[in-house]
Curated annotation (Swiss-Prot):
Polar residues bias spans: 978-990, 1086-1095, 1136-1150
Encoding gene (name): Prtg
Side Cytoplasmic, residues: 966-1193
Organism classification: Eukaryota, Metazoa, Chordata, Craniata, Vertebrata
Species annotation: Rattus norvegicus
Positions annotated as glycosylated: N84, N238, N625
Protein name (Swiss-Prot/TrEMBL): Protogenin
Gene Ontology CC terms: plasma membrane
Length: 1193
């Protein structure tokens, strides 16, 4: 919870901008409202008229009303308020119940600035009582001393005189006879003339009373007197007097010779000689008593000429009415500020301080607090603009002082937040939400949330200040099952809004904070009566609906449970074993659940043979204060067993037992003192006789904390500050805070509150105590966010909670290894390892460690280590050596620690052939893949992905081919324009083709470094079932309108006759120039049959370039961009040549320029060619076939 702040500091700038209040007319007018005359104490006789003065002065109009004993006094014919404000009572009535006029009167003066209340005036009627003490007859020897006294109560104090034989004694007599104002008559050196009857007369201005008579008898003395020590027969008595009264301290002594009486002060101060005198033979009279006269006076009777003396002492207490030593000062404060009035008074006895607002008493509650002599008003509102009075009163009178609070309002202040509503979240938290002010909401810089208990008086109001970016707040640290009142205030730089509407919300119930305190007694050897008191409301936290009793024999482990309704407070266990120790405990439950169980309380059942044993007493325990417990008991009057006494035992919970304390049979009360505050004590009591101990009674009780009334009025100390939290482990957090510099107290204790964020059950909140400014909080959940707060305790006072600090515990170290570890060889020397995070949703991984090594390195303990971040679940293992088997294992870790390694995974790297040791490693072909398929860890998901990808790629290629074919039909008409006739004979082309046989060898060498992934297809199967009429050269596709045609590559038009009726292909030549594609059929020739046709040469001369780009050392041609780069060894470059190698049995050939036969379609007749057009058939090189298959369209 945010700390309580003082929002009154927010608009402090406003005070600097305000004009001097003295320049504002009428602002200080309230100072004119004061009393010129106030009512004074008065004593009158019944039926006498009464005048009580009250004259107020100030800005008119001024209205004066009267209060009697704090209530408004109604006017009638007998009681009237005069025009000057005085009260007139025509005939005083007394001692007739409500008709009595006796009491305390005050006048209240009101004008437009406020109201002030006068001091109290006590009106009493003159009365006199009967004599409380009458003179007593006495007999003294001649020459001795005689003393008579009487006592009477009256209002006003009566004047007492004496009569001798019904004749008044003069007020001033010789030194032998002294009449004291207190009602004492002293006679020294009594003689026969003093014998007679004496009585006292008490008189006031309205009454007179006479006491009974007392006789003085003088006995003749012996002729000779013996010496005897001085004796004080009437010592001074303690006296309490008011200021300006007269005090008499009597001191009368006898002895022989006659003692000398002297006075002194016990504090060795000198006695005031101006107001003090000795009356008679040693009585001290102090007139016009003042405070400095108070003290202890010592009367000393000394035998003359000796050191023999005797003393007597008495204390003089002087009472004084209250008087101010510090007066409250008028204040001017802005809206929502804080006002503090200070008022100090002194008097004897100490005056009681109270505060008035416009004449009405203020009660400390919510935002208005009274601490001893201070009045603090928080969150000032316009209604706080008033006149405040500090009243100090004691038995001697009352006095008041006034001050004005002026509230300055800002015209541009925001309106109040509205639509405030509260929602209960848990037993200790309530969600408060509101809407922004409708007016000037854009200028709001902060909100303050105020809350306090809705029931009771003197409730503390708490305040939390929030930023302007939120309109809701969760108030926690509330008491369960309690009503709270909330309101909101909005702040801006120049002031604050009015308070929002108040809302009240109740927290949920919670489990009881502590169990009931039980009492155990036995009525027979086989039963135990269990009784308990209801849990106090502050610990109950709801309505108790169930009690659960658990009991067992101390020698057994089985527990028996009895559940009782919440309205039951005792239960009798019957059928128990005699002379056995039973353990009993109790648990209380609300509607939420069961609370904490009490500790096991032991009780021994009586012996079965204890027929004459005394019954158990009825025990009652009551804490008198924080260190004392009153133990009371009653014995059964019907118990026939004799009782010799009682034995009392007690112990603090968890400590060793004290006792027995032996008590007499007449003792029914004992006080245990010297206990510790806030401790639970177990007390047991039993009666005993000469035979044995009786049945015992057991009961537990808790001592309260030592908090006095004076302490309750002291403001609470500030909370600890700079609270700091740091996670230590996954189950502990270290806290550190600073002690506030508010006191020099040496003993300070702290309470730490700890709970997970969002906790719904307040009973799960952890409270820890320490006297240090740091603590390691243990037993927390891993990877959980907690909130912490600290409060301090000093001199039985507790501070508010410090601001809440949030911190998260560290996660646990991974308890399991990564799962699903897979290793895939993706290159000859590179493998891909993948895995999944360890099982468990709470596992947090920040790093993975990959260890891998060959078998030899593994045996030597030499691992290669890789690290990956926690979000990465794959890694590449590079620079693997062929022919080795590698061991791979992975572990997960975080900032707390390292997890375990799983079982190792092995990877075999494909060995190389000796013939290929100096070449690049080859990829596995299909047959090799079967042999080493065991080393490929491809799961079903991987295979499915590959198949889907290949299918998509083939579909795209097919769509592209269809699009090209469709678009080529529109461009057939342009083919004739792009084809040029050639004049060179076919022999030149044949020669060029023949020259390509040498280059075919180079091509074969080039293809040795290429991968072979699919079986080769001869070029004659390129279009086995016919094709389209598409002709492509370097200028683009050539489209012919002839729907029936045959494709030829480089046809010899000089010697081959085209016969359309037979549709026979006379010659087909396969040729590919990198970067150039030319497809020609015999029907597509632009020349007539027999005409020589010349094709353009896109690159270089007419001779075919059969050099493979991968193995070419150079070119005799002026190379161009049609060739692939000679520097790239990773690409596959293809060329089409016509081979002159003799055919083999495994080779498939197409017709060429020198072949004897050409392949025929089904149904075409054979047609021999001229000899000059044939040549030895050449097998197609594998590389050439591959290239032919790989030519893009």
């Amino acid at each position: 919870m945010a700390p309580p702040v003082r929002p009154g500091m927010l608009p402090l700038l406003l005070l600097l901008l305000l004009p001097p209040l003295g320049s504002v007319p009428g602002v200080w007018s309230f100072s004119e409202l004061f009393f010129m005359k106030e009512p004074q104490d008065a004593t009158v006789t019944r039926k006498d008229p009464v005048f009580l003065d009250c004259q107020a002065h100030g800005e008119g109009p001024i209205k004066v009303t009267w209060l009697k004993n704090g209530a408004k006094l109604s006017e009638n014919k007998r009681i009237q308020v005069l025009s000057n404000g005085s009260l007139y009572i025509s005939e005083a009535e007394g001692r007739r119940g409500e008709q009595s006029d006796e009491g305390f009167y005050q006048c209240l003066a009101v004008n437009k600035y406020g109201a002030i209340l006068s001091q109290k005036a006590h009106l009493t009627l003159s009365t006199i009582s009967a004599f409380e003490v009458h003179p007593v007859s006495t007999e003294v020897p001649e020459g001795g001393v005689a003393r008579f006294s009487c006592k009477i109560s009256s209002t006003p104090p009566a004047v007492i005189t004496w009569e001798f034989n019904r004749t008044a004694l003069p007020m001033t007599m010789d030194s032998r006879v002294t009449a004291l104002p207190s009602g004492v008559l002293q006679i020294y050196d009594a003689g026969p003339e003093d014998a007679g009857k004496y009585r006292c007369v008490a008189a006031t201005h309205a009454h007179k009373r006479k006491s009974m008579e007392a006789s003085l008898t003088i006995v003749p003395a012996n002729e000779t007197r013996s010496f005897y020590m001085p004796t004080i027969i009437a010592s001074p008595q303690n006296v309490t007097a008011s200021l300006h009264q007269t005090v008499v301290l009597e001191c009368m002594a006898t002895g022989y010779p006659k003692p000398i009486i002297s006075w002194s002060r016990l504090d060795h101060k000198s006695i005031d000689v101006f107001n003090t005198r000795v009356l008679g033979n040693g009585n001290l009279i102090i007139s016009d008593v003042k405070l400095q006269h108070a003290g202890v006076y010592v009367c000393r009777a000394t035998t003359p000429g000796t050191r023999n003396f005797t003393v007597a002492m008495a204390t003089l207490t002087v009472l004084a009415p209250p008087s101010f030593v510090e007066w409250p000062e008028s204040l001017t404060r802005p809206r929502a500020g804080t006002a503090r009035f200070v008022c100090q008074a002194e008097g004897i006895p100490s005056p009681k301080m109270s505060w008035l607002k416009n004449g009405r008493r203020i009660h400390s509650n919510g935002r208005i607090k009274m601490y001893n002599s201070k009045l603090v008003i928080n969150q000032i509102i316009p209604e706080d603009d008033a006149i405040y009075q500090c009243m100090a009163e004691n038995s001697q009178g009352s006095v008041l002082s006034r001050a004005r609070l002026t509230v300055v309002m800002s015209e541009d202040r925001p309106s109040a937040p509205y639509n405030v509503h509260a929602e209960t979240m848990s037993s200790s938290a309530i969600l408060l939400a509101w809407e922004r002010p409708l007016y000037n909401s854009d200028k709001v810089i902060a909100y303050s949330v105020h809350y306090m208990k809705a029931e009771g008086l003197n409730n503390e109001e708490y305040q939390v200040v929030l930023g302007n970016d939120t309109t809701h707040y969760i108030i926690d640290d509330l008491e369960p099952d309690s009503n709270y009142t909330f309101y909101i205030v909005a702040y801006m730089p120049m002031g604050a809004s009015q308070m929002s509407d108040h809302v009240t919300q109740n927290t949920l119930e919670d489990v009881p904070l502590r169990p009931p305190e039980i009492s155990l007694t036995s009525r027979s050897p086989t039963d135990i009566l269990i009784s308990w008191l209801p849990i106090p409301a502050k610990y109950r936290r709801g309505q108790v609906v169930l009690y659960r009793l658990s009991f067992r024999l101390s020698t057994e482990n089985s527990i028996q449970v009895v559940e009782l309704p919440g309205t039951v407070h005792e239960y009798l266990l019957e059928g128990l074993e005699p002379d056995s120790v039973y353990l009993v405990r109790i648990t209380a439950a609300t509607r939420v659940g069961l609370g904490e169980s009490s500790v096991w309380t032991s009780h021994r059942t009586p012996k079965a043979t204890s027929v004459k044993a005394p019954k158990s007493p009825e025990l009652h325990l009551e804490p008198l204060n924080c260190t004392t417990i009153s133990v009371r008991w009653l014995q059964d009057t019907e118990d026939p067993a004799a009782i010799r006494g009682y034995k009392l035992f007690y112990k603090e919970e968890g400590q060793q037992e004290h006792g027995p304390i032996f008590l007499d049979t007449g003792d029914l009360l004992y006080t245990l003192s010297g206990l510790d505050p806030r401790r639970k004590y177990h007390v047991r009591l039993l009666a005993y006789n000469n035979l044995e101990d009786g049945y015992q009674a057991d009961q537990t009780v808790s001592t309260p904390g030592c908090v006095s009334v004076r302490d309750r009025m002291v403001p609470p100390p500030p909370p600890p500050h700079h609270l700091y939290a740091k996670a230590n482990t996954s189950s502990s957090i270290f806290l550190h805070w600073r002690r506030p510099a508010f006191t020099t107290a040496q003993v300070i204790n702290y309470t730490i509150r700890c709970n997970p964020v969002g906790l719904q059950n307040a009973s799960l909140v952890l409270y820890l105590q320490t006297s240090e400014t740091h603590m390691l909080v243990q037993g927390l959940e891993p990877n959980t966010k907690y909130e912490f707060a600290v409060r301090l305790h000093v001199d039985q006072l507790s501070s508010p909670w410090s601001p809440v600090v949030y911190h998260t515990t560290l996660p646990e170290a991974p308890t399991g290894p990564p799962v699903g570890v897979k290793v895939t060889l993706i290159e000859d020397d590179t493998a891909l390892v993948s895995w999944k995070p360890p099982d468990g949703p709470e596992t947090v991984v920040t790093r993975y460690t990959i260890l891998y090594a060959s078998r030899k390195a593994w045996i030597a303990g030499e691992w290669q280590v890789l690290h990956r971040e926690g979000a990465i679940t794959m890694a590449l293992l590079e620079n693997l050596v062929a022919g080795n088997v590698y061991i791979v294992k992975i572990s997960a870790s975080n900032e707390v620690g390292e997890g375990p390694f799983p079982n190792s995974v092995e990877l075999a790297v494909l060995p190389k052939d000796a013939s290929e040791s100096n070449q690049r490693p080859k990829r596995l072909d299909s047959s090799d893949a079967k042999v080493y398929s065991g080393y490929y860890h491809l799961d079903q998901k991987s295979m499915t992905g590959i198949a889907v990808g290949v299918g998509i790629a083939l579909t795209c290629i097919l769509i592209c081919v269809l699009i090209l074919i469709y678009r080529s039909k529109a461009r057939k008409s342009s083919a004739s324009k792009t084809t040029q006739s050639g004049t060179q004979p076919l022999s030149r082309a044949s020669a060029s083709v023949a020259a390509g046989s040498d280059m075919g060898k180079n091509l074969e060498r080039a293809t040795e470094n290429e991968e072979s992934s699919v079986p080769m297809m001869p070029s004659c199967f390129i279009d086995a079932k016919g094709g389209t009429d598409l002709i492509i050269n370097s200028y683009g596709p050539i489209i012919k309108n002839n729907p029936k045609k045959k494709w030829r590559f480089f046809q010899d038009t000089k010697k081959i006759k085209v016969e359309q009726t037979q549709r026979r292909i006379t010659q087909t030549v396969c040729f590919y120039q990198p970067g150039t594609t030319v497809l020609i059929s015999d029907e597509d020739s632009p020349s007539s049959p027999g005409q020589t046709t010349s094709f353009p040469r896109p690159f270089g001369p007419t001779t075919l370039d059969t050099e493979h780009s991968a193995n070419s050392e150079g070119s005799h041609e002026t190379g161009d961009s049609g060739r692939f780069s000679h520097e790239s060894n990773d690409e596959i470059h293809l060329s089409s040549v016509i081979s002159s190698t003799p055919p083999t049995s495994n080779s498939l050939t197409c017709g060429d320029s020198d072949g004897d036969a050409a392949p025929k379609k089904h149904g075409d007749p054979a047609q021999p060619l001229p000899a000059e057009q044939t040549s030895a058939p050449q097998p197609t090189p594998a590389g050439l076939r591959h290239a032919a298959e790989s030519v893009p369209v």
